[in-house]
Amino acid sequence: MSSPLRILAVDVGTGTQDILLFESGKTIENCFKMVMPSPTVIVAERIKRATERGRPLLLTGVTMGGGPCHWAARDHALAGFAVAVTAEAGRTFDDDLAMVEQMGFEIIEDAEAARRVENPALLHIELQDFDAQAIVTALRAFDVDPGVDALAIAAFDHGAAPPGYSDRRFRFDFIAKTVQREPVPSAFAYLAQEIPASLTRLQAIAESTARYLQLSGSDSQAPLLLMDTGSAAALGALEDPLVRGQGDSLLCNIGNFHTLAFHLVRGRIEGIFEHHTGEITRAQLEDMLVKLADGTLTNEEVFTTSGHGALVLRQSRLNAKTFPFLAVTGPRRALLRGSALHPYEATPQGGDMMLAGCYGLLRALADHEPEMAPMIEPSLLA
């Protein structure tokens, strides 16, 4: 009897990081899972405690997701306390290090950081979106073998925009080019060697995974897949049999920080938009979904309301009978609960909406590593 296939899937969000240890041959319900605070939230809380105590900060590591940790570090500097950061870690706060210096941060060389680590008066925090030590320790604490045959990780990556290029425009321009080239959600997934150079956050995560493979005793050459988190959640929602059976559907992932919606016709993307969840009301979201469905939503309409953008590949003639099936997922999905658009709250195989991104990662890995598909798909489709 062959050994089961074991995959660690991690969906790194702004509020939580959702972790699934998949093992072929098990029902998906019996695979071990954790929903824990996101890396940026963990770092933010550590910084806030340093601010309360007036301790200077030393930030090293790699580029990671911003949001809460960005705001906490900014507030620490504004309170008059020192923030020293290495260049790679500094790009967490802005791709342009001159802008990081304008925030009041000191950019230092790695050698200088290594010297300052010895100072007990400061708080040293290593920035990273994938904390291999924490995950391995957590699994072993429950006598779970952390060894895996593959890793699949999702995160939101604005991309490294050139100076003067809006992060929002850069992000959506990349999305639009991807959809025009390959209009399917799994196009936003990449094997490690194929990650676009501009996706520096995903590149940094890929570098961090080597430590997990080492600590867990896994093969150092184990396949690694990286994916955009909103697309992973949408792909995971398709593991709900009712959603998968729709020929014409809207998939809307309402995350803690970003909302991403696809218009899919027979599995192919007809339109897409992305916005900041905190910047939109239910009425605005409903209006954008209707316009996405009929093909009249414009890029500028989304961008000028502080969103990222929209792309429509084909217009449709809609009426009450032909409006697409609307499936909603994400931790903020209650924004559409009770809507006149009659949203269906997608529940992927296994019954856990918070693991939708992890299920999407498994599906994407099966697409990108076809030899693994026969061991992944039976659990997803059970």
Roles of regions detected by a PLM:
Residues 260-263, 270-274, 281-282:
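Extended hydrophobic-aromatic, low-complexity segments
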Residues 80, 258, 268-270, 323:
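A broad structural signal for short, well-ordered beta-strand segments within beta-sheet-rich domains
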Residues 17-21, 259-263:
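Short beta-strand scaffold segments in enzyme catalytic cores
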Residues 23-25, 264-268:
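Short acidic-glycine loop/turn motifs at beta-strand connectors
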Residues 1-8, 12-14, 22-249, 275-282, ...:
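Nucleotide/phosphate-binding catalytic cleft detector across ATP-hydrolyzing
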